[in-house]
């Protein structure tokens, strides 16, 4: 069973993930990509739409899918009805899948991170292992991380926490000290800056725009006045909309 299936079929508690996704600020892609990496987990966007009202509808329909366990085809059907009613072309199956999968996976991993970092869990299972799907579709950098084990509080998880790219299928699992020892797993301290795949060197980084942990810093109280102007404007738009 892959991560996406787990999201839609398990009894995993998504209250935190739902709350976090619902509180994201809808932005145009231009606004979103102008943000520093540390602020992107507070925002939501979909490329190729300059009307924030369209992006707001994407967020609403995705949130409904996360809350209700809707399928990608449910999402695509509802969004295409809206888009076509507003003079836009409908989403192709591939594009709908990219948008749906990325956001569902992010919601799952935010919820999973909160579970893994609870004091009780960290005490019993203080190590985390990166797991990539090792097949012909796996990116070289993601494959290079496959099976690596680090302490749960290692800084690597500030960067290498999935999703680490569009259509990323990676996950992070927790391990007890006993499991690490019995399986003979190597406990990593550092990772190489460059890896080689089929004779080609790659910088060992997640994909562009996926180089921060989507769950980091979301519990902290945020002073809206300290946010970049584009997020402050989005906050005001969202506040005004909620009053209607």
Regions found by a protein language model. Give the residues of each.
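Domain-core detector
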Residues: 1-165, 173-244
């Amino acid at each position: 069973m892959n991560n996406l299936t787990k999201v839609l079929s398990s009894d995993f508690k998504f209250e935190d993930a739902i709350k976090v996704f619902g509180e994201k600020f809808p932005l145009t892609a231009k606004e979103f990509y102008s943000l520093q990496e540390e602020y992107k987990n507070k925002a939501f966007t979909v490329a190729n739409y300059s009307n924030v009202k369209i992006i707001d509808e994407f967020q609403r329909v995705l949130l409904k899918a996360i809350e209700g366990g809707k399928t990608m085809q449910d999402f695509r059907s509802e969004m295409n009805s809206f888009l076509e009613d507003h003079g836009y072309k409908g989403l192709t199956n591939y594009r709908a899948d990219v948008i749906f999968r990325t956001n569902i996976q992010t919601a799952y991993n935010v919820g999973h991170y909160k579970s893994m970092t609870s004091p009780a869990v960290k005490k019993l299972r203080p190590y985390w292992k990166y797991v990539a799907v090792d097949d012909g579709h796996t990116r070289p950098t993601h494959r290079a991380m496959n099976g690596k084990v680090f302490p749960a509080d290692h800084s690597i998880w500030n960067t290498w926490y999935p999703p680490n790219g569009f259509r990323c299928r990676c996950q992070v699992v927790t391990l007890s000290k006993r499991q690490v020892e019995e399986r003979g797993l190597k406990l990593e301290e550092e990772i190489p800056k460059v890896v080689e795949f089929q004779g080609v060197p790659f910088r060992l980084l997640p994909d562009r725009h996926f180089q921060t942990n989507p769950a980091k810093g979301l519990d902290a109280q945020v002073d809206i006045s300290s946010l970049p102007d584009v997020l402050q404007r989005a906050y005001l738009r969202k506040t005004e909309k909620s009053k209607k």
